């Protein structure tokens, strides 16, 4: 029977992830020659014998060590499912991870991972801003479990981070949680500096884990494991799913860490369902094509926005001339600026709302990474649970608009953006006349 290694190599040469998304981890002979794996829509699996069932449960609950030639069998879809196992094998290829787990949502991946790796008395040092749901979980849910969250700005220097760690008076630093690029400001965090900090202050007995939400650029344009991360997280709803038709999440790490995360997933029941897993496998086949096309269009649109008279500022990863430190991180960590753009429209919330309400081709909706372009207002939508003073500290402004660029023709997107700007300009002109 061919192994995963056999699937991934030809003539001793490693195949690239985009070439393996159609076949890795699956053999058509398993399913009547079907070129695509079927959806294993089942809750439970039949054992060949009571002895086999006992052996599977011993491994599932860690009652004994797995034998050298022993495989974990199928028990129940809350533990494992063939649709999810094939998906998870394929997910590992993009980041070069040993193992992966799929989840019911991005927040399921984040919450399960953090609860698996943290305990009462621990401290999480986290970048700010992060996605609003992550921010709420860090600051409002984890404290209920005796876990403290301490934020830091992505522009903090290694010296400032070291001072912040030294200032932790109660609890033990157990994790550095990073979202980079940050949502919605596109600020970058130096993963290598965070990894060095974790090594400096952690021990073999009490390691400090570096956990990275890689949703904005991954898994094609940034690979955190190569820069010292221990765990990589995704909202698979976004670029991995890519069609705005599913909700899912993913975590990738070493086998020992994934064993802990998967155990927590089993008992929390946060796994992805087989149908969603199958849809994600479909999406992975076009992942690189979609992300590259969207990034090409985003670069054109970001440059156009920067020159627009009604735009005060753009937040895009090739517009970092004002901050050499951010440019340096971009050069070391990122393979592309991606397709997420934020910009400040001149004015405030009223102008931002007029602009958003005037869009026609670009849809007014939260989420990102789909084939269609989306626009939203972070201050009152995705990050509305963060107080206004905290938003200001994080760089989230009332006039900020976040764009997720899809695969439409960029000329048509700019046509839509321009008519929305004109709608704002016409209202402002009328207001001046009335004044």
Please give the residue ranges for each predicted region.
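Pocket-edge structural micro-motifs
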Residues: 24-26, 41-45, 78, 345, ...
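PLP-dependent enzyme catalytic core of the Aspartate aminotransferase-like
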Residues: 2-4, 98, 139, 148, ...
């Amino acid at each position: 029977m061919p192994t995963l290694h056999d699937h991934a190599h030809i003539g001793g040469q490693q195949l690239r992830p985009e070439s393996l998304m159609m076949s890795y981890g699956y053999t058509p002979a398993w399913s009547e020659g079907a070129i695509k794996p079927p959806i294993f829509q089942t809750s439970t699996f039949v054992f060949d014998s009571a002895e086999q069932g006992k052996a599977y449960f011993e491994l599932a609950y860690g009652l004994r060590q797995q034998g050298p030639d022993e495989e974990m069998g199928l028990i129940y879809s809350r533990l494992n499912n063939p649709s999810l196992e094939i998906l998870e094998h394929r997910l590992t290829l993009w980041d070069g991870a040993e193992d992966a787990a799929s989840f019911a949502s991005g927040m399921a991946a984040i919450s399960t991972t953090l609860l698996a790796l943290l305990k009462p008395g621990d401290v999480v040092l986290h970048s700010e801003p992060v996605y609003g749901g992550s921010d709420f979980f860090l600051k409002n849910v984890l404290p209920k479990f005796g876990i403290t969250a301490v934020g830091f700005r992505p522009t903090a220097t290694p010296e400032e981070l070291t001072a912040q760690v030294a200032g932790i008076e109660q609890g033990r630093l157990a994790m550095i949680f990073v979202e980079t690029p940050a949502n919605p400001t596109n600020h970058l965090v130096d993963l290598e500096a965070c990894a060095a900090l974790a090594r400096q202050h952690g021990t073999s007995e009490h390691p400090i884990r570096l956990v990275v939400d890689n949703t904005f650029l991954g898994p094609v344009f940034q690979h955190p494991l190569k820069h010292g991360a221990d765990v990589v997280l995704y909202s698979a709803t976004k670029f991995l799913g890519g069609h705005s038709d599913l909700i899912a999440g993913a975590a990738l790490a070493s086998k020992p860490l994934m064993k802990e995360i998967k155990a927590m997933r089993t008992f929390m029941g946060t796994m992805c369902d087989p149908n969603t897993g199958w849809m994600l496998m479909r999406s992975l086949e076009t992942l690189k094509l979609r992300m590259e096309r969207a990034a090409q269009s985003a670069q054109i649109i970001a440059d156009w926005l920067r020159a627009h008279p009604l735009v005060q500022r753009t937040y895009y990863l090739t517009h970092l001339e004002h901050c050499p430190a951010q440019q340096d991180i971009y050069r070391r960590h990122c393979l592309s600026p991606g397709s997420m753009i934020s910009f400040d429209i001149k004015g405030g919330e009223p102008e931002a709302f007029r602009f958003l309400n005037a869009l026609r081709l670009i849809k007014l909706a939260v989420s990102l990474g789909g084939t269609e372009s989306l626009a939203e207002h972070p201050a009152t939508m995705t990050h509305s649970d963060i107080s206004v003073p905290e938003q200001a500290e994080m760089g989230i402004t009332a006039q900020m608009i976040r764009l997720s660029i899809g695969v439409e023709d960029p000329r048509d997107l700019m046509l839509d953006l321009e008519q929305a700007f004109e709608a704002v300009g016409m209202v402002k002109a009328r207001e001046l006349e009335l004044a």
